[in-house]
UniProtKB/Swiss-Prot annotation:
<feature type="binding site" description="covalent">
    <location>
        <position position="587"/>
    </location>
    <ligand>
        <name>heme c 12</name>
    </ligand>
</feature>
<dbReference type="GO" id="GO:0009279">
    <property type="term" value="C:cell outer membrane"/>
</dbReference>
<feature type="binding site" description="covalent">
    <location>
        <position position="185"/>
    </location>
    <ligand>
        <name>heme c 5</name>
    </ligand>
</feature>
<feature type="binding site" description="axial binding residue">
    <location>
        <position position="85"/>
    </location>
    <ligand>
        <name>heme c 2</name>
    </ligand>
</feature>
<keyword id="KW-0408">Iron</keyword>
<feature type="binding site" description="axial binding residue">
    <location>
        <position position="591"/>
    </location>
    <ligand>
        <name>heme c 12</name>
    </ligand>
</feature>
<feature type="binding site" description="covalent">
    <location>
        <position position="433"/>
    </location>
    <ligand>
        <name>heme c 9</name>
    </ligand>
</feature>
<feature type="binding site" description="axial binding residue">
    <location>
        <position position="52"/>
    </location>
    <ligand>
        <name>heme c 1</name>
    </ligand>
</feature>
<feature type="lipid moiety-binding region" description="S-diacylglycerol cysteine">
    <location>
        <position position="24"/>
    </location>
</feature>
<feature type="binding site" description="covalent">
    <location>
        <position position="480"/>
    </location>
    <ligand>
        <name>heme c 10</name>
    </ligand>
</feature>
<feature type="binding site" description="axial binding residue">
    <location>
        <position position="307"/>
    </location>
    <ligand>
        <name>heme c 7</name>
    </ligand>
</feature>
<keyword id="KW-0349">Heme</keyword>
<protein>
    <recommendedName>
        <fullName>C-type polyheme cytochrome OmcB</fullName>
    </recommendedName>
</protein>
<feature type="binding site" description="covalent">
    <location>
        <position position="84"/>
    </location>
    <ligand>
        <name>heme c 2</name>
    </ligand>
</feature>
<comment type="function">
    <text>Involved in anaerobic respiration with Fe(3+) as terminal electron acceptor. Acts as an electron-transport mediator in the dissimilatory reduction of Fe(3+).</text>
</comment>
<feature type="binding site" description="covalent">
    <location>
        <position position="141"/>
    </location>
    <ligand>
        <name>heme c 4</name>
    </ligand>
</feature>
<feature type="binding site" description="covalent">
    <location>
        <position position="110"/>
    </location>
    <ligand>
        <name>heme c 3</name>
    </ligand>
</feature>
């Protein structure tokens, strides 16, 4: 039996994706003569069916032709049997055929990302948990830990929650076989690559029903994967965990491993609607909770949105890191997996499951994803970077993307409407940046030309024109540039017309690292040069101009050439923030010999960068402009003590009189100094991205705001802040060491 299973497993691995493009294989599935794969003429499906209609799958007894005609994407796409097996003109039932038993590598011949959608099945499955797991043939375990048990259970209806699987009547519905084998391609795929249909039992010893946990009346990927990796009951009505209610949400019990939190999909893939942001237009939802990822359950690839055939996530504590766990602990996921680990700690069993289900991230670590009701139309302009949906839609079609977010649909979020949004929020999921998580294929927005909207306000009589800045094409790093260019640039201030210089602060927004890297987003003072030195090379990393640093541009070249690529961190740090290791391989390519970087040197550089920004903040405070890290960022120092007192740090006390410092003619330069401070405070890696550009911005901002003149008296300006007790001497010394005694 096992030999037959092995034989048909190979045959059934024709395709692992439901999409294939015309042009693969024969010209016509019904036999217009042409040359098929393997260089042999084709004869059409009718000839195949004549002889092979009686051939059955050894394990199930089902007709292979019936399976193919029922579910194969190659049949419905009009490709035909010969698109996988090769031309049949020499076959005639006994002669050769090019690919009698096509395997996963045969699939890859067409599924290369060009002819048809790419698949990582030919390489990834071999090392997957599905392929290397221990065969378990016990009454319950064989349902998901053997090929035969899974396939026969699909037919018998032995699928469902714990009560269903532990019921002996249900167990006895599944025929026994003489031996059991590993999960294979054929466990999930019928002949021709279609997904197997799954039956379930409604409760213990209940009637057999269709397994349809996303309740869309279609056999799809979510049904297949969650038949073992349970998340919902057969009709989607009940969340399956360990049976303990979660913040008022009733749950059932998963089919097995109900006391092992990292085996329960819902501990990481369920975001509790009841704890989400306030619904409604304009709702802020500040400090909403996100407990898990929200799956696009009825989409084409709800599981393959983030997984491929590698089937190895390694969520279990202590396991080797994977791309999935790196991402889940990263800022793009708000550190959600870290929150789960911290909540579980040393707990075990049901207590661990409860802790994991209730663990969440909020504004503390995930402010980019939790602070507002991002999917409501009132936040439409934010959706490009604060939702995976907006990011994916922009990168798929930058020219056609509506910056108001009007084209974004979040129908996979519970209760969503465009006006009110949903009480669930997205993180930056894998599919935000990738078109294919299994192969790693990135979205391709091309070189980013950013349109920084004009600054306009009817209340202050302010008008401004839009500013357009073109950035170079940096391959895969274009994906990063999509959201790391800020919302406003220094040029926006220069493009403003305002009669009295009294207006709200122009906010650069956060983490605009790409703009600093290419020296384009700061407020640049007239008569000063900001051209990069000829030897500056950080903007060339990941290009042909910097051999040995990769091919995906500077963002990926620095942040993703580490053992933990999807942590997006080029260094590791200890609890104090000190750099403990430089893990990016790009650094050592150039910084070698006398220019070699050390963790200690990089820590010192960062500390001096921060000190120079403290000096700039102090100089601004000396003019009555107080910085506080909350919108609108700059406030009036009403008692002139140089300190942001609680009563001063409120939005009604926002600093707006920029002309009041040095007169109407210079108001833009005053705001420019504040703009540069805000821009760089919110780019903590600015010292590494482009140290020449950021030093010049800080130098010129301190130089100007101190006395309204660009006269290079920066050292005196910093010393004056110490004298006025707005800056301590140690910080002043570090700031002067960073900036030097002459303009960088």
């Amino acid at each position: 039996m096992s030999r037959k299973v092995t034989k048909y497993s190979a045959v059934l691995a024709v395709s692992l994706f439901a999409a294939a493009l015309a042009g693969c294989g024969s010209e016509n599935k019904e036999g217009t003569v042409g040359t098929g794969p393997g260089g042999v003429a084709t004869v059409g499906d009718s000839a195949c069916v004549q002889c092979h209609s009686a051939v059955t799958e050894a394990l199930t007894g089902e007709s292979l032709i019936a399976q193919y005609q029922k579910s194969s994407p190659h049949n419905t796409a009009g490709l035909g049997c010969e698109s996988c097996h090769g031309g049949g003109a020499q076959h005639n039932g006994v002669g050769p055929i090019p690919f009698a038993q096509p395997d996963a590598s045969r699939c890859a011949d067409c599924h290369d990302g060009t002819t048809a959608v790419a698949t990582n099945s030919d390489t990834a499955f071999a090392e997957s948990r599905h392929n290397i797991q221990t065969i378990r043939s016990g009454a319950t375990c064989r349902r998901c830990h053997t090929h035969e048990g899974a396939v026969l259970s699909n037919i018998a209806g032995y699928t469902g929650d714990l009560a269903t699987l532990e019921d002996t009547v249900n167990q006895n519905k599944v025929p026994l076989v003489s031996s059991y084998s590993q999960i294979s391609c054929a466990t999930c795929h019928e002949h021709g690559g279609g997904l197997r249909t799954i039956k379930a039992t409604n409760g213990a010893a209940g009637p057999v029903v269709n397994w349809d946990p996303n309740n869309n009346r279609t056999v799809d990927q979510f049904d297949l994967c969650t038949s073992c990796h349970n998340m919902y009951s057969y009709n989607g009505s009940t969340l399956l965990t360990n049976g303990v209610p979660v913040n008022g949400v009733a749950t059932g019990t998963v089919g097995h491993h109900e006391t092992t939190w990292y085996r329960i999909i819902a501990t990481t893939h369920f975001d509790n609607y009841s704890t989400g942001p306030q619904a409604g237009a304009g709702a802020s939802g500040t400090n909403a909770k996100v407990e898990g990822y929200v799956l696009r359950r009825t989409g084409a690839n709800p599981c393959f949105d983030c997984h491929g055939h590698e089937a190895k996530t390694n969520t279990r504590p202590g396991r080797d890191a994977t791309i999935h766990t790196d991402w889940a602990k990263s800022a793009h996921a708000g550190g959600l997996l870290t929150a789960k680990y911290n909540a579980v700690g040393a707990l075990t069993g049901a207590a661990a499951v409860n802790a994991a289900m209730n663990a969440y991230v909020d504004d503390t670590t995930a402010i980019a994803w939790t602070h507002y009701n991002w999917d409501a139309s009132s936040r439409g302009s934010c959706q490009r970077c604060h939702t995976a949906t907006g990011a994916a839609n922009f990168m798929s079609n930058p020219a056609g993307y509506d910056p108001t977010g009007a084209g974004n649909s979040f129908s996979h979020l519970q209760g969503w409407s465009a006006a009110n949004g949903s009480k669930q929020n997205e993180l930056l999921y894998c599919w935000g940046c990738h078109t294919n998580a299994g192969t790693g294929e990135l979205r391709n927005p091309g070189a980013i030309t950013e349109n920084y909207a004009g600054v306009n306000s009817t209340s202050t009589g302010t008008t401004g024109t839009a500013v357009t800045i073109s950035y170079p094409d940096i391959a895969g790093s274009n994906v990063c540039m999509t959201c790391h260019l800020g919302r406003e640039a220094g040029e926006n201030i220069k493009a403003i017309t305002d009669a009295d210089g009294i207006l709200g602060f122009v906010n650069s927004h956060y983490l605009a690292a790409g703009g600093q890297l290419f020296g384009k987003t700061g407020y640049e003072y007239a008569t000063r040069s900001y051209a990069k030195p000829t030897f500056f090379a950080h903007d060339k990393i990941g290009t042909a101009a910097a051999p040995g640093t990769g091919t995906n541009g500077p963002c990926a070249g620095c942040h993703m050439t580490t053992p933990n690529s999807h942590s997006f961190l080029p260094v590791t740090k200890d609890g104090t923030g000190a750099v403990t290791a430089i893990t990016s391989t790009a650094c050592a390519t150039c910084h070698a010999g006398a220019y070699a970087l050390t963790p200690e040197a990089l820590t010192a550089e960062e500390e001096e960068y921060v000190a120079s920004l403290e000096a700039l903040k102090a100089a601004l405070a000396g003019k009555g402009i107080l910085f506080f890290n909350a919108h609108p960022y700059f406030y009036r120092d009403t008692n002139a003590n140089g300190i942001g007192d609680p009563g001063e740090l409120v939005s009604s006390n926002a600093f707006t009189n920029w002309a009041g410092v040095y007169g109407l003619a210079l108001w833009k330069d005053v705001m420019g100094a504040a703009f540069n401070a805000n821009l760089l405070i919110h780019d903590p890696g600015g010292y590494a991205h482009n140290r020449f550009y950021v030093k010049r911005l800080i130098w010129d901002s301190i130089d100007f705001i101190y006395d309204g003149v660009l006269n290079n008296d920066v050292t005196a300006a910093i010393d004056a802040q110490v004298t006025a007790t707005r800056l301590d001497s140690a910080t002043a010394t570090a700031a002067k060491a960073y900036l030097g005694t002459t303009r960088p």
